Amino acid sequence: MPSHPKLQCLKRSFYEPSASVVALELLGHWLIRNTPEGMCGGVIVETEAYLCDDPACHGAPGLTARNKVLFGEPGHGYVYFIYGCHYCVNAVCQPQGTAEAVLIRALEPVFGEELMRRNRPVSKTRDLTNGPGKLCQAMAIDRKLDGVDLCNPASPLIIAQNPEFNRLRKSLGPVVTTTRIGITRAATLPRRFYLKSSKFVSIKERPTSQTIPSGRTTQKEEDCQPPHSRSRITKP
């Protein structure tokens, strides 16, 4: 897949910190899909963090054939199928061997809206990509992209640096931190993040919401070391 000359992928080192840090940092950058029909994508406005000590993380049960991408090199895409009808795309974080990821929940269309509408016909633009399953349908993201290198400009799916990042974070911020959506395990953990002023956030009203300043975060968490049993691939 040819690379776009004006797009600069986020470096692999960007994804090496904890998913809780990367989830905040991704807000304002671009998720871009390259297809034979053209390019589409937009600004990431909502994310969720899943850490290695998190019962809701797909890596919590250990390494399997289905979740092995989670335990691999940071900066790759982890795509899974849910509810028998939707795909979800995540960015893998932390050094190899530690299963953490950021779920990309919503984005604001910037490129190729017409192409996205062909993939997902809707009457309102807001409904095009305001949810993890919706954005995957609009951008034709499925399990074929599981393991895709998000740091390679020639990949069919990348996360690119937004040259207007600082301005956009100020205009759409501050960042709101809330509990995550649609999970039953560790449901009270405040690990969902979104840009408050974006109209493309999936759900804004949550009882534990709090705002944090826009801009680069300095949040740090202790690294999690996967147990020895996770080094063995088991049946999914």
Q: Can you annotate each of these PLM segments?
A:
Residues 2-224, 228-236:
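Conserved, well-structured core segments that form or line functional sites
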